[in-house]
């Protein structure tokens, strides 16, 4: 490996690492704000776990000296000192391991315990990913000077250029096993039989994440040549066009189905196109790349719809995008790959058969082992958070990380339960929630002031009524004792006082109704703003 090749692979490793930020933005924006911090920290933590385990023994299993094509040995706790080629190869592959692991995060978002997710991440990066990676990619280690004989799938002719199956499908199948074990989010599939759409908290943030992923994909596919070769520009063009094809197909489907172009299908469609081309970006012609991306997008859409029909709740459609499109992309090596470039010596039907074998083995291995492990673990250690914690949100229940919205709801809940009108919401004047909190405090100031005036008016009425009653009882009712002037007779006096009391009571009742209407209008605005996020606010008196 030349110096320029080493530099190129280092740059591509950085681009793949940047994809972690893309996944974090995408998943945080597609989930509710009460869970966004949890989603972000999962993407951060799983990277640390995956790289640590991959360095400890995962790299050795995947790229060590092959033991009959089933696992590798000899490179545990790998020391790359003085071997730049080995160092850059390890770094690049460690980033791939992190990508496969973080796909799981989005699928099972909003109901999985943080500690349980760390166990899933450890299983994925420490065993499932490196072992299947050995079967399909062990021979790549020769680039780093490791004398190995390749994995058994690889030796049969299975080809997956940059990981449609090895990376993306592995993560998707583990994610599918996880969400089947923990079940759907509360309210996702109500008893009415209809699927409830849970709106994400920040679509622009998700679009930013999609663009970051697209940018990182250039390093993902471009670096899989392990050098700055003449094939790299064509691979990058195929990558971009497949993403574009996926986006255009998703926009067309959305327009036909929903009579408008929605945001989520565009994002998922472009990502599905990128996943699909990942297996064959180096062996297909440019027009075919766009077809592969567009078809992968359509397949991901159909898989996502079918999962909803089956009651499977994937928070970000990770299984459809990375699993469905990953299967299609891997099969495309046999369907559309230029056989001289595929270079396995197989004819097209044989190549398709080997690709299907690899897809099936990956599904059985990744999904099967993850499902068995998590099902058994769930019997002794609850993987899912409690319904109460799910209602509050994982930001608070798992990390004690409050938000302005949560603090606003806390104050409103306390006021509803304690009837303490003196409570006020903390105000940050530079945020939208801060503006809402400020208006809420203004309403409560007015409500409290009117409440005090109402109490004073009622006290005055009580005093006048008590004085009249006492005077009548003592037969000493006199107008001047009550501060009433020019009263002609006792009957007129009592009638006037009765009318005054009635008018004051009606005025107080009308004032209370106005205050209640103002408060209800504010609460309805709050509930409308957060209804799409699935956050409930208990404001019952």
Swiss-Prot record:
Query: Where, by residue number, does the polypeptide cross the bilayer?
Result: 6-26, 44-64, 86-106, 117-137, 161-181, 203-223, 235-255, 260-280, 283-303, 316-336, 356-376
Q: Does the keyword Transport apply?
A: yes
UniProt cross-references to CDD domains, sorted A to Z: HAMP
* Listed NCBIfam families: amt
Q: Would you name any one GO CC term?
A: plasma membrane
* InterPro entries found in the cross-reference section: Ammonium/urea_transptr, Ammonium_transpt, Ammonium_transpt_CS, HAMP_dom, NH4_transpt_AmtB-like_dom
Pfam families assigned: Ammonium_transp, HAMP
What this protein is called in its record is Putative ammonium transporter sll0537
**Ligase as a keyword?**
no
Compartments where found: Cell membrane
Q: So what family is this one in? A: Belongs to the ammonia transporter channel (TC 1.A.11.2) family.
A molecular function annotated in GO for this UniProt entry is:
ammonium channel activity
Its membrane topology, per UniProt?
A: Multi-pass membrane protein
Keyword annotations from UniProtKB, A to Z = Ammonia transport, Cell membrane, Membrane, Transmembrane, Transmembrane helix, Transport
| Domain of life the protein comes from | Bacteria
Q: What organism is this sequence from?
A: Synechocystis sp. (strain ATCC 27184 / PCC 6803 / Kazusa)
The alphabetized list of GO BP terms reads:
ammonium homeostasis; ammonium transmembrane transport; signal transduction
């Amino acid at each position: 490996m030349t110096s320029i090749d080493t530099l190129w692979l280092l740059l591509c490793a950085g681009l793949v690492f940047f994809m972690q930020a893309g996944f974090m933005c995408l998943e945080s924006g597609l989930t509710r704000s009460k869970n966004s911090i949890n989603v972000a920290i999962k993407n951060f933590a799983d990277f640390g776990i995956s790289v640590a385990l991959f360095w400890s023994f995962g790299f050795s299993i995947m790229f060590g000296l092959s033991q009959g094509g089933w696992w590798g040995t000899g490179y545990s706790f790998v020391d790359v000192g003085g071997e730049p080629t080995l160092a850059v190869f390890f770094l690049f592959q460690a980033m791939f391991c992190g990508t496969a692991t973080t796909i799981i995060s989005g699928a099972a978002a909003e109901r999985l315990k943080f500690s349980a997710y760390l166990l899933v991440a450890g299983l994925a990066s420490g065993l499932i990913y490196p072992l299947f990676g050995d079967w399909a990619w062990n021979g790549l280690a020769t680039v780093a000077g490791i004398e190995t004989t390749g994995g058994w799938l690889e030796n049969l002719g299975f080809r997956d250029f940059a990981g449609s199956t090895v990376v993306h499908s592995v993560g998707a199948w583990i994610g599918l096993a996880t969400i089947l074990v923990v079940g759907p989010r509360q309210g996702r599939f109500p008893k009415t039989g209809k699927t409830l759409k849970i709106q994400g908290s920040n679509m622009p943030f998700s679009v930013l994440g999609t663009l970051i992923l697209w940018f990182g994909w250039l390093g993902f596919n471009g670096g899989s040549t392990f050098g700055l070769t003449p094939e790299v520009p064509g691979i990058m063009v195929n990558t971009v066009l497949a993403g574009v094809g996926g986006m255009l197909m998703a926009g067309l489907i959305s327009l036909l189905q929903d009579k408008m172009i929605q945001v989520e299908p565009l994002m998922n469609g472009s990502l599905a196109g990128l996943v699909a081309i990942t297996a064959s970006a180096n062996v297909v012609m440019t027009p075919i790349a766009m077809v592969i991306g567009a078809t992968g997008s359509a397949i991901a859409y159909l898989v996502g719809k079918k999962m909803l029909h089956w009651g499977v709740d994937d928070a970000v459609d990770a299984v459809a995008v990375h699993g469905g499109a990953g299967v299609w992309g891997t099969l495309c090596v046999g369907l559309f790959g230029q056989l001289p470039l595929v270079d396995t010596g197989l004819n097209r039907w044989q190549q398709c058969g080997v690709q299907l074998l690899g897809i099936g083995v990956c599904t059985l291995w990744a999904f099967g082992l993850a499902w068995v492990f998590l099902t058994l673990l769930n019997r002794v250690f609850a993987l899912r958070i409690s319904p109460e914690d799910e209602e509050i949100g994982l930001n608070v229940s798992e990390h004690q990380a409050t938000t302005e919205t949560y603090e606003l709801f806390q104050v409103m809940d306390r006021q509803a339960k304690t009837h303490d009108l003196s409570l006020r919401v903390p105000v940050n004047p530079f945020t939208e929630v801060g503006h809402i909190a400020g208006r809420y405090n203004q309403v409560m100031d007015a409500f409290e002031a009117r409440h005090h005036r109402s109490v004073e008016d009622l006290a005055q009425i009580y005093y006048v009524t008590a004085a009249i009653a006492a005077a009548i009882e003592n037969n000493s009712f006199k107008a001047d004792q009550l501060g009433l002037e020019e009263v002609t007779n006792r009957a007129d006096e009592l009638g006037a006082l009765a009318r005054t009391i009635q008018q004051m009571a009606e005025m107080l009742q009308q004032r209370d109704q106005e205050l209640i209407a103002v408060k209800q209008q504010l609460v309805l605005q709050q509930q409308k703003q957060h209804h799409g996020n699935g956050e409930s606010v208990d404001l019952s008196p």
